[in-house]
């Protein structure tokens, strides 16, 4: 099944199932190692959704990944890993009046902080990994940081 799945996936999105890539993506900041079947690199929301749909239809486990900074092995899995940090990593819009930001899931926390600061705003969470941790991962883990009592966790922002 994996060969036909990968063939279908390659028609939709950039995929790497090489030994080196699978080894690099077999761990995050945690101690567990689980080699994935393959790693895909979506460039658009449509590509990500197409990969999600195909994985679901074929029963292939899917793990979304950003910076791989989770100490709890949340960024690894045995099926398809979607790495959002390579291409989907931008701050798309800051609305200072509404105090909101629209970002792609692979946007690094410190990148959002810098963009928000230009408008006199900040994104509350400041984990020690904020120069590598992505917003998608911060949302998934409800990240916080040393100033959480003042500025809140991700779910508070």
What spans do the regions from the language model cover?
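Conserved strand-loop elements at the edges of beta-sheets that form or border functional pockets
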Residues: 42, 64, 105
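FAD-binding subdomain of flavoenzyme oxidoreductases
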Residues: 91-94, 100-157
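Extended, hydrophobic alpha-helical segments in both membrane/secreted and soluble proteins
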Residues: 62-64, 71, 112
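Short, basic and Ser/Thr-rich N-terminal targeting/leader segments
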Residues: 56-58, 65-67, 133, 157
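N-terminal flexible segment immediately upstream of the FAD-binding catalytic core
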Residues: 1-57, 67-99, 128, 151
């Amino acid at each position: 099944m994996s060969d036909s799945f990968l063939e279908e996936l390659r028609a939709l999105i950039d995929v790497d199932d090489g030994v080196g890539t699978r080894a690099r993506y077999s761990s995050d900041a945690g101690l567990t190692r689980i080699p994935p079947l393959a790693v895909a690199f979506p460039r658009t929301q449509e590509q990500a959704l197409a990969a999600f749909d195909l994985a679901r239809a074929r029963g292939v486990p899917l793990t979304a990944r950003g910076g791989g900074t989770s100490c709890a092995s949340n960024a690894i899995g045995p099926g398809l890993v979607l790495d959002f940090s390579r291409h989907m990593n931008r701050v798309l819009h800051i609305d200072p009046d509404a105090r909101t930001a629209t970002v792609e899931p692979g946007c690094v926390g410190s990148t959002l902080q810098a963009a928000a600061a230009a408008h006199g705003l900040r994104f509350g969470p400041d984990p020690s990994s904020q120069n590598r941790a992505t917003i998608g991962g911060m949302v998934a883990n409800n990240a916080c940081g040393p100033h959480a009592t003042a500025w809140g966790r991700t779910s508070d922002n």
